[in-house]
Swiss-Prot record:
Pfam families named in the record: DAP_epimerase
Designated name of the protein: Diaminopimelate epimerase
Annotated compartments: Cytoplasm
SUPFAM superfamilies hit by this protein: Diaminopimelate epimerase-like
PANTHER family reported in the protein's UniProt record: DIAMINOPIMELATE EPIMERASE, DIAMINOPIMELATE EPIMERASE, CHLOROPLASTIC
GO terms (BP aspect): lysine biosynthetic process via diaminopimelate
A cellular component annotation (GO) from this entry: cytosol
UniProt catalytic activity: (2S,6S)-2,6-diaminopimelate = meso-2,6-diaminopimelate
Primary enzyme class: isomerase
InterPro entries: DAP_epimerase_AS, DAP_epimerase_DapF
Function, in words: Catalyzes the stereoinversion of LL-2,6-diaminopimelate (L,L-DAP) to meso-diaminopimelate (meso-DAP), a precursor of L-lysine and an essential component of the bacterial peptidoglycan.
Length: 288
């Protein structure tokens, strides 16, 4: 079976985007992995699927598969590429669309300058809903934030659990470029306190409106940018009293602008969405 695809990226976080409305998509976990392979497939951090909605109050359904073949709840950078894709393909003439994801609905708006703003909804901070199981962990309060101590590589990592529709553990560090992200990231991702694994974010505060961020993504490893990770990091930074909205987040792949007014207000993310190329791939050519 041959599939039409579009290769896109949002601040360097790269995706294979597939139209699941006009072509049948029934891939195995192994096929998703092969499609994401940078040696044997197209290569991507995640695969994004456009589907018909399952409810009447939204325009599309948005599904995400990680490079390891697992389906996940959300991807913020992918959401920006999603609305660019459906607009460029003539699947909608709206500048703003409502999209269902695994755990809710998000609103995506294409701006006149080509940037995309995503209404990510309110952050979820209740540990059980992240989900996070902190029983027995040391606790430290800073501002409105409650951080929990994980023993990682012989050090205590003080993490703030935040869900942006997917789970994040945010750690504030002094020098993110020289921090051992590749060593600590997998240990946090697979820590027993996160039953569904977790995206590990490493946040450096530059000033009250500027931050640097690296994210070790669940099922993908470190990526050049992570939209939900940037949102979670800003939420944690604001709650700790270290940041004020709006915040420009510098990632290795580019800048994301994050705004949050606190409490139950939605987090708003603005950033780029770029089409790289289009193509056709024969699933029979992928390794089994």
């Amino acid at each position: 079976m041959k599939l039409q695809f579009t290769k896109m990226h949002g601040a360097g976080n790269d995706f294979v985007v597939l139209d699941g409305i006009h072509q049948k998509l029934d891939l195995t976990t192994e096929q998703w992995r092969a499609l994401a392979s940078r040696h044997f497939g197209v290569g991507a951090d995640q695969m994004l699927i456009v589907e018909k909605p399952t409810r009447e109050d939204v325009d599309f359904r948005y599904r995400i598969f990680n490079a390891d073949g697992s389906e996940v709840e959300h991807c913020g950078n992918g959401a920006r590429c999603f609305v660019r894709f459906v607009t460029d393909k003539g699947m909608t003439d709206k500048r703003s669309v409502r999209v269902e994801v695994m755990n809710g609905v998000i609103t995506l708006t294409l701006q006149d300058d080509g940037q995309v703003t995503v209404d990510m909804g309110a952050p979820e901070l209740e540990p059980a809903r992240v989900p996070f199981r902190p029983d027995g962990l040391p606790v430290r309060t800073q501002g409105e934030d409650i951080a929990y101590g994980l023993e990682i590589n012989g050090r205590t990592a003080w993490i703030s659990p935040v869900s942006m529709g997917n789970p994040h553990a945010v750690q504030v560090v002094d020098d993110v470029e020289n921090f051992p992200v590749l060593q600590d990231g997998p240990l946090i991702e697979h820590h027993a306190t996160f039953p569904n694994r977790v995206n590990a974010g490493f946040l450096q505060v530059v000033d009250r409106h500027t931050a640097r961020l690296r994210v070790f993504e669940r099922g993908a490893g470190e990526t050049l940018a992570c939209g939900t990770g940037a949102c979670a990091a800003v939420v944690a930074g604001i709650r700790r009293g270290l940041l004020d909205s709006p915040v420009k987040v510098h990632t290795h792949g580019g800048d994301l602008n994050i705004a949050w007014d606190g409490g139950a207000e939605p987090v708003r993310m603005t950033g780029p969405a770029t089409t790289v190329f289009e193509g056709t791939i024969d699933l029979a050519a992928l390794p089994a």
